[in-house]
Amino acid sequence: MPPTNGQTAIIQSKTCPTPTTLPLVVAHGRPLPPLPSSHHVRVRVLAVGLNPTDHKMVTHFFMQDNTTGCDFCGIIEEVGSASALPLGLRVCGADFPYRPSNPYNGAFAEYAVADSRHLLQIPDAISNIQAAAIGAIGWGTAALAMSDPTALNLPGTPSKPDARSLPVLVYGGATATGIIAIQMLKRSGYIPIAVCSAQSAPLCISLGAVGTACYTSTTCVQDIKALANGQSIKHALDCITDPESTTVCLASLARIGGRYACLEAVSDACITRRSVAVKVVMGFEGQNFDVDLGHPVYSRKANPALHAVAAQWAAELQPLLNAGIIKTQPLEEIEGRFEGVIKALEMLQGGHIKGKKLVVNISS
């Protein structure tokens, strides 16, 4: 049962008792988040996965005293009346706590709340930290990039693959989102072409990429086009989103144009092709909440259609998870529970982690 005297959580605070590069502190006696709908459940958190958004949001959109953390694995201990899942089930998923109207919910806590329609049931063969690495931020972002009509608008799914076998460029193929996107695209009938380092190429190919191009190569664009085997590339997912990645993606798309989905705001100066439709994908749009960050690109209104997309993809991925097919980046477990989370986020922010997913056990 949830504690009656509040819970422990990592919150945003500029009054940290010890020096830290991030405005985060471990707080006790925090209120438990309420269930915002009859579809939501309360989960006792067992382990968490860390994402770049967890340090970027508290750095650029600081919200005093808000709880933090997205990806988690845990056990359902309370259910809403319309929950799709029962009590006692071990699940993984995510919340997006970085919004002003959501001060108490977040994965970096003893208890988190999530929409049951977006959770995955964890098979016994998958450990807590493996499940936390799967979470939902990566696959949820990839799902919206693929299926949002204003993003890549790709209709294929694992249960109904697209028979056209279209090539899809994934820049940053070895990132957490890139890795799951390659798998989702491959299972949905598409031909993923990954841009990554030479060291990450074997991993991307093993997950379903038809081939890789090295982002440091002077022939990167030519190599990408060669991997398309004569087909025009009309879809690109940019999991890095900087001037270099944007340039490569746009140059790789067909002369007649295409679609470019990215994960960060892009300078207008970088968008050099009017024939390319651009969408900055925010994974939190799948949660169907208003998110007002005071920024024209990152603020979004609740979107029921994208909430349905996320729910559809949870249903699509469950059989793959049951079969042991879904893979993540190699894991690096950081000790220390909540203090370990802050340490790990500082490692991630400092650029010390490449090609690994940081995970932390929370259960004592």
Swiss-Prot record:
| Reaction equations catalysed | 7 malonyl-CoA + acetyl-CoA + 10 AH2 + 5 S-adenosyl-L-methionine + 2 H(+) = dehydroprobetaenone I + 10 A + 5 S-adenosyl-L-homocysteine + 7 CO2 + 8 CoA + 6 H2O
> Which CDD domains would you find in this protein's record?
enoyl_reductase_like (cd08249)
Q: Which GO terms describe its molecular function?
A: nucleotide binding; oxidoreductase activity, acting on NAD(P)H
Pathways per UniProt: Mycotoxin biosynthesis
Q: Where does NADP(+) bind?
A: 53-56, 174-177, 197-200, 215, 263-264, 353-354
According to the lineage, what is the superkingdom?
A: Eukaryota
Enumerate the residues binding substrate.
139-146, 283-287
Cite the entry's keywords alphabetically.
NADP, Nucleotide-binding, Oxidoreductase
- Stored SUPFAM superfamilies: GroES-like, NAD(P)-binding Rossmann-fold domains
EC numbers listed for it are: 1.-.-.-
InterPro entries linked to this entry = ADH-like_N (IPR013154), GroES-like_sf (IPR011032), NAD(P)-bd_dom_sf (IPR036291), PKS_ER (IPR020843), Trans-enoyl_RdTase-like (IPR047122)
What this chain does, per the entry, is described as: Trans-enoyl reductase; part of the gene cluster that mediates the biosynthesis of betaenones, phytotoxic polyketides involved in leaf spot disease in sugar beets. The first step of the pathway is the synthesis of dehydroprobetaenone I by the polyketide synthase bet1 and the enoyl reductase bet3 via condensation of one acetyl-CoA starter unit with 7 malonyl-CoA units and 5 methylations. The C-terminal reductase (R) domain of bet1 catalyzes the reductive release of the polyketide chain.
Q: Which PANTHER family match?
A: HYPOTHETICAL OXIDOREDUCTASE (EUROFUNG), TRANS-ENOYL REDUCTASE STHE
Oligomer and partners: Monomer.
Q: Which family does it belong to?
A: Belongs to the zinc-containing alcohol dehydrogenase family.
Protein name per the record: Trans-enoyl reductase bet3
Give the species this sequence originates from: Neocamarosporium betae
Organismal lineage: Eukaryota, Fungi, Dikarya, Ascomycota, Pezizomycotina
